[in-house]
Amino acid sequence: MRKTNRISRMTGRALSVFCLFGLGAVAENAPSAFLMPSRMTSVPAGQVHELGGFIGERYRLNTEARLLGDLGFEYEKFLRMVEEKKTAQWCFVGEHPGKWLEAAIWSSQATGNAALRAKAEETLRRMIAAQEPDGYLGIMATSLRTPAQPLRGMDPYEQYFTLHALITAYEAWGSKPALEAAKKLADYYVNTVGPGKVEFWPKHEDRSNGCGTIAGHAAHQCLEGTLFIDPMMRLYQATGEKRYLEWTQWVVANINRWGKMNDPKLNVFDDLDLVADGKKTIGAVKGWSHSHTWHMNFLGMLRLYQATGDATLLRKVEGAMRDIMSRQVFATGAVSVHECYQTDQLLPNGSAVAETCASMSWLELNQYLLEMTANPVYADTIEKVMFNHLPAAQASDGGGFGYHTALVGTKVRQMGGQTCCQGSGHRATAELVRFFYATDKEGLYVNQFVPSTVRLKLATGTGVTLKQATGYPNDETIRIDVTPEKAERFALRVRLPSWCEKPVLTVNGKPVSDLKPGSYCALKREWKAGDVVELRLPMTPYWLKGEYNNSGLVCLKRGPLVYMVDGIWVEGGLRDLRSMEAVAVDICAAPVVEALPAGFMGPALAVPVRIVDQPAKVVKMVPFANAGRWYIDEADKEKRPDRNLYGAWLAPVGSERNAAAVSLEVARRVELPNVIDRTGPSFKDEAHNPQNGKEKPSGWSHLGYRTRHSGDWFSWDLKVLPDVPITLRVGCSGGEFGIKKFSFDVLVDGQKVGEMKVPAPEGRVDGVFALPAELTKGKDKVTVRFQAHPGKQAGRVFDLLTIKGK
């Protein structure tokens, strides 16, 4: 029986809630639901305490400002939606109570925050009270639920997190009511989705947006419903009740058939074998190869493999992972381009990349595979995301998370809002403590290096305390104090990151030989109180050369950290550049380590930098993890303007890409004094009379551009001068999802002045059109219209100017 520690700091009210809900019991492992057990078992959040360092501070902010303080997030509103059940529209907001509850359970356990614990208990009580007698626990209007329509389109995705949270409440607190609520919710799916009932094909009545009635968006085919196999199999693992296993097997057996309902050529499930064979990429298995959705389905397949021993499932998932890791992982460890996996090597820097939802499930998928296989490659990936992209997506005051976090982008003051990624960000951060340590029959694993204390038991029942003291990854040294209750022989396995070529490890000052990077160092010995392990991971900064769309660019790395040029550390800022490629770095000069103020991931690396045509000057490059911070210190916080540029991939001094970007910037200096009018994502769109054809007006859409399909159009009005030559400039960013379908005419007051074709996502395209004199004669404004070519799309416009002169 594996038990979890209970938080000792509880109020009297919290204790009464424990008694009311039967929370005093400790969850027991179900009868063995594993034919294929994991190689290691992660240590629960309740046994990991005293987090320190940068991760510890971000964890504290997430706990206090976000989960407890509700900074920038209307948590109560979403909980009331579950209680009131009035939602009719297709949307994805019903996941927030489940995401919040699970995050609050983990965080309250790790931090001992009694107020958060009480709030989590109350949330659990309200969610259980809101459950319908038939088991439904979502936000769909009760009047709309029928046997033919038991689910709203996003219910499976939203209730994925609800079911996980209920199971976590049972496993962490021993809550029998939570387990019963979990079973009722799972039984609702068993009773309503199945042979002769509804299935996970999303019938979409509104074909203009593809919103499904049963299982999410039609573009996901069935996978936005089948993802429910993950919490369903977790419930089977917790209870051993066969109906959850059998339902999951039925779902997996129908993935191919449901996928074909959208496209008869698809073999969504079987083609994963082609991915494993190297004959296909995960991005080519289906259209809209949504990363986050794949991850959740893969987790369910792995649980099903463990329960049944069906090795074909493991082969499919591991094959997909090999494909993803070979070409679709950013230097920061994150994944997803426009939320999806692509068919090629495309990893754009400045587009909509590294969705926070995808980062969350990517972390979980790597952790699950690490536990199953003990392959440290998965721990290495977690390390990259944990120290780079996840904190970069987090506002440094704890006030929110970005939807996407570009590797070359613009800083903003607020990351608030109520998107799916907001909930995923605080859930992923809260879950980090589960990734640090693990156990097996022989002993213990140290998987991640974060200042922390863990108290656990060996398979023999002997208690052991491990305490990590480290400034990693700022510093090179990790000290691990090992304190068993009594002297005992066991294995302590310490991960040696693959990036470190020459690690140094000692036990009580004595060096250990034959250390292999990218493996675990197994220290099998008799351990006693006072034993100390020290690991030193030498970090030499180096420039990583880019490939494919990053060819000709470089990225500065030190240890697991990716660095960036950050406008807040540049005198005068970087607010007016069109491209970060106009910022050139001297890769021949050795970077110099410099300290950063408290609150930053550090250290800085001082590097000579040339901005446009200015003389080179030394600039502090800082870790990418700081991308969510727009100021240097509190005194600077309010006066510092946002929208500073930053970039992790940079052009070297003297490179072709830098020379081209500098030429554009110099030309722009001449252009700017002659600009008559301009619109774009940073401007008041309404002042320019936005119009479009068949589709509803949307202004600058959520990604900063309009997209109009075959034959459709959109337009703006721009000012001109009546009797002078006028040039129209149209700035576009690369096409969406790797599909080169953006092709459209440019018309001014109905007359075609040119056309544009926008390539795949990386890069910028400028259209420059000299307007005929008769078009502007006697006018003070014109209408600029973009008309999609047949079978193509019009869009990706982010900058539109009228300029005096030719």
PLM regions: where:
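Bacterial N-terminal signal peptides that target proteins for export
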Residues: R2-L15
